[in-house]
Amino acid sequence: MVMKKKRIIAMILAGGQGTRLKELTEDLAKPAVAFGGKYRIIDFTLTNCSNSGIDTVGVLTQYEPRILNNHIGRGSPWDLDRMDGGVTVLQPHTRKNDEKGWYKGTANAIYQNIKFIEEYDPEYVLILSGDHIYKMNYDKMLQFHIQKDADATIGVFKVPLVDAPSFGIMNTKDDMSIYEFEEKPKEPKSDLASMGIYIFNWKLLKKYLDEDEKDPNSSNDFGKNIIPNMLNDGKKMFAYPFKGYWRDVGTIQSFWDAHMDLLSEDNELDLFDKSWRVNTRQGIYTPSYFTKESKIKNTLIDKGCIVEGEIEHSVIFSGVKIGKNSKIIDSIIMADTEIGDNVTIQKAIIANDVKIVDNIVIGDGKKIAVVGEKKIIDSQSLVK
């Protein structure tokens, strides 16, 4: 059955485990990790879709999907609770006489959901990652794709050449047509890194997905298989240069850095930008309360907090309690964490629902200390 035909639909790859985030992803998928005081990482991609006029979105989940599924719900925070389209959570599944099961790679994840895509008979399919922090108008990228008469367009972001070996790199001609793709090259020729954002002409992509699935030697991956195969076949592929804030927060260091970016005077992300409001699903909290003794400097604080101590250059999520004479410096304190009196926390990431008793020191200001959610930190605990 074909529902109302869509010009373009988006498919968000959101099943990643995020092992490099360690304690932060023990019980939830990377796109569900909290960010920026009240958001989750996937909020940025969902908001981009909504603000770009894309009203049909499939979210492909796999690892620890419960919290992510509950957060997305019917999609109302992003105006994606629609009868014809909207947001649909797509989990790996098996069918009768079918042993597909878990997604084997990014391309296989899309392949397993071809029927969902075909319901809307789109001209174009936008493939996205659900675990990056950025604000982007995908419609501008689509117009670029159409103007270039491209078969595929890949979003790229300029990185320092010294960092290029950590990314998939696009080598392009002057007109931004791609002539070579190198996955994490030791000696990069270009500084244009793939953002993991692709626009494909759907009928052509479906053909390549079908062929890739039949190849027993394939990794079933866009970067390793689909993109190189299309290039080898001479398809018209272009790089779309994105200018703005974009961060892969896949490591503890990059996650902490992205939060510290929010506190800089020249913050490019700007969560207070009314023209591109980032939407989320959030609980109901009272306004935050600050005692006479509290001291706050260059800090982002959400609702529902009670602060009796000092906070400097930190991001404090909703519902956090900070006791008397406690000092929080260069840190990220996630929702509903309770910090006792005379506690010092420096350059640390404290996850949700942590209880820290009085007179505890966490972090030395050099290495980033991390405390997983729902932990109790007492005098017997050791946090580095």
UniProtKB/Swiss-Prot annotation:
It comes from the Bacteria. Pfam families: Hexapep_GlmU, NTP_transferase. One of its GO terms (biological process) is glycogen biosynthetic process. HAMAP family: GlgC. Belongs to the bacterial/plant glucose-1-phosphate adenylyltransferase family. Homotetramer. This is Glucose-1-phosphate adenylyltransferase.
